[in-house]
From Swiss-Prot:
GO BP term, pick one: translation
GO molecular function, one term: metal ion binding
Record's protein name: Peptide deformylase
Binding residues annotated for Fe cation, in chain numbering: C98, H140, H144
Provenance organism: Bradyrhizobium diazoefficiens (strain JCM 10833 / BCRC 13528 / IAM 13628 / NBRC 14792 / USDA 110)
Catalysed reaction equations from the record: N-terminal N-formyl-L-methionyl-[peptide] + H2O = N-terminal L-methionyl-[peptide] + formate
Family: Belongs to the polypeptide deformylase family.
Cofactor(s), names only, from the UniProt record: Fe(2+)
Annotated SUPFAM superfamilies: Peptide deformylase
Leader sequence residues: none
Catalytic residues (UniProt): E141
E.C. designation(s): 3.5.1.88
Keyword Iron found: yes
EC supergroup of this enzyme: hydrolase
Amino acid sequence: MALREIIILPDKQLRLVSKPIEKVTTEIRKLADDMFETMYDAPGIGLAAIQIAQPLRLITMDLAKRDENGETKPEPRVFINPEVIASSEELSVYEEGCLSIPEYYEEVERPAKVRVRFTDLDGKVHEEDAEGLYATCIQHEIDHLNGVLFVDYLSKLKRDRVLKKFEKAAKRAE
């Protein structure tokens, strides 16, 4: 496993539409391992491959829960070629953040429940219903695969303010 660099807004790669994965290979498994290491190190709960400059339809996620003793139990999940195949009309609002837009959080409204189809690392296709944080996180990460960022859901004024802030920071870093 290896830590990868997370690309940051305004990197134009974040706007790429990621390519489907044709076959689960050793390279894809290694990429998923690297993504988990990078995600846990950041720390974050979800990471799309494009966030480490790999334009592939691959997501890692861990919405670890605490057990009755207060211990956190990791729940690493891999989603290959994920897609939302149904969503509720009911909406929910969660405060979202993003490893590619560090230290910026904003409330985003999304469907409260979604049905997701994806392939796992064994090549098996699954369909699952997601709600709550799981629904929000999977939609956020699938958006990344389509070149969409959570700030795209904000008002034009807020979105433009965030984009300008990160563009200025990138220029200062050059």
